[in-house]
């Protein structure tokens, strides 16, 4: 059925349907009205009946009138009901009609769709039915005046155009998704390049493209055809196939093109729809036969300048897998050019392994061409007058010429395809990867644009909010920072600015250097393209070079700058922010590990040093990376000394949280000084150096055997915060007198930054000697001498590290010597009060340190060299070292008899105060941890005033406590020999240091009476005494021993830091309570205190 008729019928159907629909709508409206009327009438009738019921009978006329009225009403109701029924039926019929019409319309629509099926689908169908079908394009040559009979064997070389063979062209005739046509004997895809009918510029493009093709191997020209284009070609070809119904060997007269010419139908062949199948199938079959025939023999027979004339109607494309194809456009005989009106459609075909000649040749005898022109040169000049390009595929000298004439179907082409051939710049494809060219506007233009943009925004804002204009046009006069600051701050602000400028200048210089280096490297290295591209793009290169080098300079310069930051320690030294001194036995530095690593790792371990065991905790005798180990047994003390200077200073973060700063063994004592350098420039995370000078693990840890336990688990945050805080103090106080800092740091740092655990004060015989020996063997010079040496040390960092290590070792030596000396002289000393000893020792240590601290103030200005941190570390260390005297024996089994009571008693005060300090610190640290972020903000560190005050108060309190304790101890010793009758007399709990809730400063209750106090403790303590001595232990001792036993049992469970800290505080409290409970008479204060403790702690004790 003709398409037009179908359209007409469909339109009629649609009109009918519309008509029915309007009718239905009208009827529905009527129906609704009728229904309303009916309801109204019914209700009216009902109402009247109801009203009339109670009315007394009137005259006969009235009765008659009423009856008539009611009848009328009833009739109307009935009428309405009939109407409604009728309307409903009509609507029903109309709807059924409408549905029939719409069904009919649907059928018509489907028929139309069938006729409108794209010819691509037909083509698909045909090619799939024919197993070996090739996609063909047969084209009309509408007005070619010359007639020639077609010869079965065309001459391949005819138009002199040759194509260098290209491998495996993509099939262009099929849409991208479809497979390339597979001819059985010729499995090569075809390529069509089409020219739009009237566009001369397209001719030119084709010609120039021919040149390009011959110049370089091209990708399949498929890219030059858009999918629409391809589909269009297929449709066209099918249309034309149909219009050339049979292709026979007899020539068709070209004078009568109408015989084959079918006018374009916009892709729909309405009239010939039915016959299309047969015609197309016939043509395809015929062409296949021709191809098979040609495939065998034509290649041999074809001459280069034979005079064969094609059948004008159809052209066969044969493709095969073949060597690369180049196309060249070729001038054609002028007689043809003149007579031709529609530019031809050009087909590319790959020659099959036995190249095939075309089944048809376009009219005319092509001029004979010498073989060499056709052969390898592959490029023939294009004559400007020629409107046709013919392509030949050459393989081993045999050519297949394909010239196709195409009738104009331009309405189907993709409109932009002619203007923008996608192949135009294909040759430069490899260059694209080489260059990245960005369009950058000149800065003036940008400024201009920005200005305009702002103006626009302003104008809009002013429109919306006129009040805003006043602000803009009369901005408030802002004061500069300089005006706002007072003199003190102004000065520091200026200094800060100067520093900033200096730094910026240095960075600029660096960048310039880098840029110069970059420019010296020829940019061509960076963007070397293949030589061919260089030849082509030599001009472009000149233009591109600037852009490219600029980009490369920037990114490369940045990279190099970053790299240099690592190596540039010396340069950056002066500008870094103050550094932290953190005591870090077991926690990571604040900065990320990575921030430390690049800087600290480069230090090579000294050759002689013992092997490093970086991951594990420093087990006895093993050296953890930063630790100076002094294996006195191994006898490598000298080594260690050198190592002290050059050894690897690895950051604590690297050596893992478990490492101990003192690994102690019978034979070894290793002190560790860890110098952690965090490069501020790179990672502004930490201060320039966070040095952890961890000399001597907290003595408590060693003594109490808590090493792994508490080192591992005590809240690291506490330490971190505190150490940072105190290091801040240190820095800010750097100008202050050493004594002040020392006083500050002495207890607070020691106690703060190290895990606080009780320590038995039993001297360890072997250890004292070992330590002192190994350290004294080191032969470290005094800090001041080292400072003197400093110029000799090439790298300031190494110098710092050396100082650090020496200090560590020196201090350890001092401790050990001190310990050894004090062992002998201690009884007497402690009679005078341990406080004295502690202070003496500290004084002694400070004596050794003072030269150093004297040295420091000049260095403080460059934070990198600031050596201050050694003080805090050493102070705590000494503090601890003095207290350190015991090995980690859970019970004091090795106590030598003799006046050890003195020694034991000494730690009592410090032991307890240490506990409360630990608690206090935990609480303050937890506060501090939250504040820390503020503390570290900006280039300056602020130390918390609260912290400082607290530490001073604690010191005073502790000093007082210790003095009291000393007196008590003396009294106790005197009383210990008194009559056994007093044994049961409980003394007041005055001697106990009350463990208060964390953060509260402990109170020491002075003993009301010396008599009751001391002896009362002896009975309970005596049973616990170890074999060495029958002397009574004081409360402190007992508690510590309890603690030790308890701890050794539960060491495994201690890893959780919160658990540990809780346990420490709870345990101590409970033990204090137990000890207190022994005493019969308790002061009101004691009772109250105990009650409070019980209330707070009982649950925890039960854990």
UniProtKB/Swiss-Prot annotation:
The keyword Glycoprotein applies. Keywords: Cell membrane, Coiled coil, Glycoprotein, GPI-anchor, Isopeptide bond, Lipoprotein, Membrane, Phosphoprotein, Ubl conjugation. This is PALM2-AKAP2 fusion protein. Transmembrane segments: none annotated. One of its GO terms (cellular component) is apical plasma membrane. Residues 444-521, 941-979 form a coiled coil. There is a cross-link at residue 405 (Glycyl lysine isopeptide (Lys-Gly) (interchain with G-Cter in SUMO1)). It holds the Pfam family Paralemmin. Residues 490-505, 533-544, 817-829, 865-886 have a biased composition (Basic and acidic residues). Residues 380-392, 506-521 have a biased composition (Low complexity).
């Amino acid at each position: 059925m003709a398409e037009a008729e179908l359209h007409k019928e469909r339109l009629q159907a649609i009109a009918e349907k519309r008509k029915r629909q309007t009718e239905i709508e009208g009827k529905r409206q009527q129906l609704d009205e009728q229904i309303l009327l009916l309801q109204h009438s019914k209700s009216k009738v009902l109402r009247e009946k109801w009203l009339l019921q109670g009315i007394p009978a009137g005259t006969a006329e009235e009765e008659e009138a009423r009856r008539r009225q009611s009848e009328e009403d009833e009739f109307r109701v009935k009428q309405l009901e009939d109407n409604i029924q009728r309307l409903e039926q009509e609507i029903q019929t109309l709807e059924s009609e409408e549905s029939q019409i719409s069904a009919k319309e649907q059928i018509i629509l489907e028929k139309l769709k069938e006729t409108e099926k794209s010819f691509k689908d037909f083509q698909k169908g045909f090619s799939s039915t024919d197993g070996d079908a090739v996609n063909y394009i047969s084209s009309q040559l509408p007005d070619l005046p010359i007639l020639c009979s077609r010869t079965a064997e065309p001459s391949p070389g005819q138009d002199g155009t040759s194509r260098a063979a290209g491998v495996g062209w993509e099939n262009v005739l099929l849409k991208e998704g479809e497979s390339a046509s597979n001819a059985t004997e010729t499995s090569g895809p075809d390529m069509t390049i089409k020219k739009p009918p009237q566009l001369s510029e397209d001719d030119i493009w084709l010609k120039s493209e021919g040149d390009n093709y011959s110049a370089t191997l091209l990708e399949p020209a498929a890219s030059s055809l858009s999918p629409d284009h391809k589909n269009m070609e297929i449709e066209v070809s099918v249309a034309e196939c149909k219009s050339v119904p049979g292709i026979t060997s007899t020539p068709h007269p070209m004078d009568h093109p109408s015989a084959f010419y079918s006018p374009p139908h916009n892709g729909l062949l309405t009239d010939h729809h039915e016959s299309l199948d047969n015609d197309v199938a016939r043509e395809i079959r015929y062409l296949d036969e021709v191809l098979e025939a040609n495939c065998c023999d034509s290649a041999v027979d074809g001459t280069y300048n034979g005079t064969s004339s094609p059948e004008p109607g159809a052209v066969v494309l044969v493709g095969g897998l073949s060597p690369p194809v180049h196309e060249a456009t070729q001038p054609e005989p002028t007689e043809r050019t003149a007579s031709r009106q529609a530019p031809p459609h050009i087909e590319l075909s790959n020659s099959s392994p036995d190249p095939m000649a075309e089944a048809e040749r376009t009219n005319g005898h092509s001029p004979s061409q010498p073989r060499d022109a056709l052969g390898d040169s592959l490029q023939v000049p294009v004559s400007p007058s020629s409107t046709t390009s013919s392509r030949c595929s050459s393989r081993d000298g045999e050519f297949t010429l394909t010239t196709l004439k195409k009738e104009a179907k331009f309405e189907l082409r993709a409109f932009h395809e002619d203007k923008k051939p996608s192949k135009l710049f294909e040759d430069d494809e490899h260059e694209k990867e080489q260059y990245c060219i960005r369009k950058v506007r000149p800065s003036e233009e940008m400024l201009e644009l920005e200005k305009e943009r702002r103006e626009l925004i302003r104008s809009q804002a002013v429109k919306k909010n006129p009040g805003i204009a006043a602000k803009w046009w009369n901005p408030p006069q802002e004061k500069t920072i300089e005006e706002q600051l007072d003199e003190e701050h102004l000065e520091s602000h200026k200094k800060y600015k100067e520093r900033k400028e200096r730094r910026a200048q240095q960075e600029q210089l660096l960048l310039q250097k880098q840029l110069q280096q970059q420019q010296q490297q020829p940019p061509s290295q960076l963007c070397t393209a293949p030589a061919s591209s260089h030849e082509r793009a030599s001009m472009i290169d000149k233009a591109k070079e600037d852009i490219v080098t600029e980009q490369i300079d920037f990114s490369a310069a940045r990279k190099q700058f970053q790299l240099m930051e690592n190596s540039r320690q010396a340069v950056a030294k002066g500008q870094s922010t103050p550094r932290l001194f953190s005591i870090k036995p077991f926690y990571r530095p604040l900065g990320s590990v990575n921030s430390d690593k690049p800087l600290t790792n480069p230090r090579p371990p000294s050759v002689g040093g013992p092997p490093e065991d970086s991951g594990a905790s420093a087990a006895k005798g093993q050296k953890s990376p930063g630790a100076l180990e002094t294996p006195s047994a191994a006898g490598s003390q000298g080594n260690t000394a050198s190592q002290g200077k050059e050894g690897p200073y690895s950051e604590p973060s690297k050596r893992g949280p478990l490492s101990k700063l003192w690994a102690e063994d019978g034979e070894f004592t290793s002190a560790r000084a860890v110098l952690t350098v965090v490069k501020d420039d790179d990672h502004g995370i930490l201060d320039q150096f966070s040095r952890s000078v961890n000399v001597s693990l907290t003595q408590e840890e060693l003594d109490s055997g808590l090493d792994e336990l508490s080192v591992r688990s005590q809240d690291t945050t506490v330490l971190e915060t505190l150490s940072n805080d105190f290091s801040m103090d240190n820095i800010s106080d750097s100008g202050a007198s050493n004594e002040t800092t020392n006083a500050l740091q002495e207890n607070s740092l020691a106690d703060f930054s190290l895990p606080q655990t009780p320590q038995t004060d039993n001297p360890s015989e072997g250890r004292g000697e070992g330590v002192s020996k190994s350290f004294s063997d080191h032969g470290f010079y005094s800090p001041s001498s080292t400072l003197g040496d400093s110029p000799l040390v090439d790298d300031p960092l190494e110098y710092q590290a050396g100082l650090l290590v020496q200090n560590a070792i020196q201090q350890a030596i001092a401790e050990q010597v001190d310990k050894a000396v004090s062992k002998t002289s201690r009884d007497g000393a402690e009679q005078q009060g341990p406080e004295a000893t502690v202070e003496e020792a500290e004084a002694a240590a400070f004596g050794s340190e003072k030269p150093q601290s004297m040295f420091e103030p000049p260095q403080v200005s460059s934070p990198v060299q600031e050596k201050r941190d050694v003080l805090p570390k050493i102070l705590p260390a000494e503090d601890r070292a003095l207290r350190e005297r015991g090995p980690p024996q859970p019970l004091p089994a090795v106590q030598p008899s003799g006046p050890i009571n003195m020694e034991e008693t000494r730690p009592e005060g410090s032991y307890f105060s240490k506990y409360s300090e630990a608690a206090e610190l935990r609480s303050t640290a937890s506060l501090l941890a939250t504040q820390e972020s503020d503390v570290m903000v900006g280039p300056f560190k602020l130390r918390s005033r609260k912290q400082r005050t607290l530490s001073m108060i604690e010191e005073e309190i502790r000093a007082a406590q210790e003095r009291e304790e000393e007196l008590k101890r003396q009294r106790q010793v005197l009383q210990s020999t008194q009559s056994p009758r007093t044994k049961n007399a409980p003394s007041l709990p005055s001697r106990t240091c009350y463990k208060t809730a964390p953060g509260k400063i402990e109170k020491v209750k002075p003993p009301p009476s010396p008599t009751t106090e001391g002896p009362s403790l002896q009975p309970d303590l005596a049973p616990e005494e170890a074999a060495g001595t029958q002397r009574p232990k004081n409360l402190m001792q007992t508690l510590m021993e309890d603690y030790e036993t308890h701890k050794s049992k539960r060491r495994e469970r201690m890893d959780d830091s919160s658990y540990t800290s809780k346990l420490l505080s709870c345990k101590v409290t409970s033990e204090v309570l137990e000890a207190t409970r022994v005493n019969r008479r308790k002061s009101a204060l004691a009772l109250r205190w105990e009650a409070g403790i019980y209330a707070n702690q009982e649950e925890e004790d039960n854990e």
